[in-house]
């Protein structure tokens, strides 16, 4: 599960860059 955290953070960061 912990291995999915960096991926989730990267996804949120990528989305946040559009705003």
From Swiss-Prot:
* Broad class of where this protein is predominantly found: secreted
Per the record, the similarity remark reads:
Belongs to the frog skin active peptide (FSAP) family. Phylloseptin subfamily.
Tissues where the protein occurs: Expressed by the skin glands.
Q: What is the annotated localization of this protein?
A: Secreted
In what way is this protein post-translationally modified?
A: Shorter peptides due to unspecific cleavage of this peptide have also been identified.
GO process annotations (BP)? innate immune response
Domain of life (superkingdom): Eukaryota
Q: Name one GO cellular component term.
A: extracellular region
Q: Does the keyword Transferase apply?
A: no
- Do the record's keywords include Secreted? yes
Task: Kindly provide the name given to this protein in its UniProt entry.
Answer: Phylloseptin-N1
Its keywords, alphabetically, are:
Amidation, Amphibian defense peptide, Antimicrobial, Immunity, Innate immunity, Secreted
Where does the record place the modification Phenylalanine amide?
A: 19
What's the stated role of this polypeptide? Antimicrobial peptide with low activity against Leishmania species (L.amazonensis and L.infantum). Shows low cytotoxicity against mammalian cells in models of peritoneal macrophages.
The protein's organism comes out as Pithecopus nordestinus
